[in-house]
Amino acid sequence: CQVKWKDNSPQANYYDEYEAYEWKYTEKGYLFLEEYHPPGFDGAPGETGFRVQPLDKTCRELNRKYVMPLGYALNNLLITNWDNQNYTELDFYDLYEKMYYMKYGKQVPYEANYGGAEYEVPEDEFEEVIKTYLPFSNTEIEKGTFYNSNNKTFRYRPRGLYDCEFPYEPYPEVISYEKLQDGTLKLTIEAVWEIRMLDQAITSELMIKPMEDGSFQYLSNKVIKSDQNANAGWYMPRLTEEEWEENYSNN
């Protein structure tokens, strides 16, 4: 049963009934159910998770404002150790796409195609998006990308057939927070991965700097190792230069 709140009351707007193949209740307070599928079934996965134990209201609000807009899909910011000194593992192209939507409410205006599309994005456009949410200078952004200093553009290749991502990624959940003396926020985030029936697939500490005008920046992320953590197998890195040439050079 899918329930949404309306006028401070729960309203059921979808109902389904099925035989549970497996179920699990976690210490954290999640109930996971797996729908039975016959051998050979190739449809959508049947795992569903429900949080039974209520989550702190402030944690939910912080999650909605700072974490859910980025999430775990098509970027590695929440699954990578990074700060303003060590950031080489971040993929600025992934973050450009995600943060463009966060900033403007629409997708980047550069479409992928079967033959491997390639664009030259003006430096002001690319850097403005990244610098809105991350504390990096123009020089640092240029070092982590393919930047053409002659025409002041960034080479941008949308993801395509060969680096598309697994569709059933986890969703983030802020489980605790701390406001530091300098005004920054430290959020402890756990990944709830329904298809693996895990409520702590990845745990990390994300540092955020809220601004007076309501905007914010991500400052760093630290992955917390745990026996309950899983490999972030949903994330697909973009093609390397060699892989891109191998797959698209003849198109």
Language model features: what each stretch is:
Residues 1-11, 130, 153-194:
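Surface-exposed, charged secondary-structure patches
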Residues 5, 20, 25, 29, ...:
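Low-complexity, intrinsically disordered terminal/linker segments enriched in charged
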Residues 7, 27, 38-47, 69, ...:
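Intrinsically disordered, low-complexity segments enriched in small/polar residues
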Residues 10, 30-31, 185, 215-216:
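Hydrophobic residues embedded in beta-strands of well-ordered beta-sheets
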Residues 14-16:
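Short, solvent-exposed loop/turn segments at conserved positions within beta-propeller repeat blades
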Residues 50-160:
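Core segments of small alpha/beta cavity-forming domains
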Residues 128, 146-163, 192-194, 209, ...:
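Active-site-adjacent structural elements in enzyme catalytic domains
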